[in-house]
Amino acid sequence: MESLKCYRERFKGVFTDFISLKVSKKPVFDSQNYLVYGANNEVSKKEFVPREDDFCAIPILNDRDEAIISIAERMRHDDLSHSRWALGIITGNNAKVLKDRPKKDLEPIFTGKDIGKYSLKPASRYIKFNRADFQQCAKDEFYRAKEKLVYKFVSSRLCFTYDDTQSLFLNSANILIPEVDGMSIKTVLAFLNSSLFNFLYVKRFGDLKILRGNLSALPFPKIDAETDRKLSALVDEALKGNGNAVAAIDKVIFELYQFDTEEIRIIQEL
């Protein structure tokens, strides 16, 4: 790869950005240098290190973005690659299976639209849970887990919440039962909903869907037991709708990484 140019203009009826890429047939080395021509005609020289887990993604980052990501990566201690994951239910026929009102033998089922950060709207759909009727359904142990995280699948930003009601979810929501060294499930939730992790996800991947492979690549730091307890307690408050707790979670995480004022501004303004 020799150069990459970003364009300010967009094609009519198309909402995504577009680029031109100049490549040449040469041997691939451990790292590659290339030029990036920005939409405002600025030029910068970048280095790209090909790795299998990058899925050939070429991040377009400025120096401050790269510095923030580098700080997070240096503090990497664990990730979600060994956690447990499940998809929401695919009924195969929502119009037939989903009901608008509760009735005997029906239970609430939630969708991705019901999920907010640290919140879950009241269910507006109900279903009879009979896995033989569904096109695809995860094991009961995921839906009925004592604690689980659920997240909006179709989204450009991370949006997770906590469920301890053994509720059902449709396939517009996915399920995560995290296993991160030294962190409770609620502390993992704090990081996933933080401004920092949203920044890392958007800058590194920029997808319109929240993919398991991308989430598994996010770097979790090593924390002590006191920080784990503090973040878990703040999540309890955030789940009650306390907006101050959400800001306090970000503050704890920023202090953990020792970001300066300018770095915090960049992260929060995304």
Locations of regions flagged by a protein language model:
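Signature of N6-adenine DNA methyltransferases within the class I
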Residues: 1-98, 169-173, 180, 185, ...
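Low-complexity, glycine/alanine/valine/leucine- and proline-rich hydrophobic stretches
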Residues: 165-167, 188, 192-193
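Proline-centric
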Residues: 27, 173-185, 198-243, 254-260
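Conserved short secondary-structure elements within globular domains
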Residues: 1-6, 193-201
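Non-catalytic DNA-recognition/assembly elements of restriction-modification systems
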Residues: 48-93, 106, 112-113, 222-270
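Short helix/loop capping segments that flank catalytic or ligand/cofactor-binding pockets
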Residues: 31-32, 118-121, 159-162, 185-186, ...
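Polyanion-binding catalytic cores of nucleic-acid enzymes and NTP/SAM-utilizing transferases
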Residues: 57-168, 172-177
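Conserved hydrophobic/aromatic beta-strand scaffold that supports enzyme active sites
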Residues: 18-22, 109, 150, 175, ...
